[in-house]
Amino acid sequence: MTNQNVVIIDTGCSNVSSVRFAIERLGYEVTISRDPQVVLAADKLFLPGVGTASEAMKNLAERDLIELVKQVEKPLLGICLGMQLLGKLSEEKGQKADQIVDCLGLCDGEVRKLQTGDLPLPHMGWNTIKPVEGNPLFKDIPENSYFYFVHSFGMQVGDYTIASCDYGQPFTAALQAGNYYGVQFHPERSSKVGSKLIQNFLEL
């Protein structure tokens, strides 16, 4: 149904236009907001993010969004850094205790620098993913479909993983923790399969 209340959370640390256009192309109207009433009244929410986890968490705190995101009961999709923020912590600044970035803690995932061997970082470009069977986020998406990635840090594979990818090491390409979903890739930049994934999320 295209009359859903769809909200992109205005974190201040992402370029929301490409995500907005991808949703609008599917026939949905989109609101960009950080207003608690608007966010909590949404049927579906998107949490995009670019940049660093430390800057993103700082922005979320300054905008009083940390607790608000944790109160969301409807499906929420974190994209790229937005997915990483759903995890417990990020080591993007280093592995020492005073360098660890605390994230939202909505799943147990920990974000660490990808160990890629001779492969270049960032992991940038098209790669295939391996979804688990039966998750509705990947309904009617062909096996071995390519999605577009741009990242140097990844979340380890865990119980929350609903799709994995391999780039020197396996990492979580998509996760689900209750009503919270996340994708490390950019569905809004992943052609028809990316559009299908966004449609699947909106139809949950």
UniProtKB/Swiss-Prot annotation:
Residues 5-204 form the Glutamine amidotransferase type-1 domain. Pathway: Amino-acid biosynthesis; L-histidine biosynthesis; L-histidine from 5-phospho-alpha-D-ribose 1-diphosphate: step 5/9. It comes from the Bacteria. Keywords: Amino-acid biosynthesis, Cytoplasm, Glutamine amidotransferase, Histidine biosynthesis, Hydrolase, Lyase. This is Imidazole glycerol phosphate synthase subunit HisH. One of its GO terms (cellular component) is cytoplasm. The gene is hisH. Its main location: cytoplasm. It comes from Aliivibrio fischeri (strain ATCC 700601 / ES114). It catalyses: 5-[(5-phospho-1-deoxy-D-ribulos-1-ylimino)methylamino]-1-(5-phospho-beta-D-ribosyl)imidazole-4-carboxamide + L-glutamine = D-erythro-1-(imidazol-4-yl)glycerol 3-phosphate + 5-amino-1-(5-phospho-beta-D-ribosyl)imidazole-4-carboxamide + L-glutamate + H(+); L-glutamine + H2O = L-glutamate + NH4(+). IGPS catalyzes the conversion of PRFAR and glutamine to IGP, AICAR and glutamate. The HisH subunit catalyzes the hydrolysis of glutamine to glutamate and ammonia as part of the synthesis of IGP and AICAR. The resulting ammonia molecule is channeled to the active site of HisF. CDD domains: GATase1_IGP_Synthase.
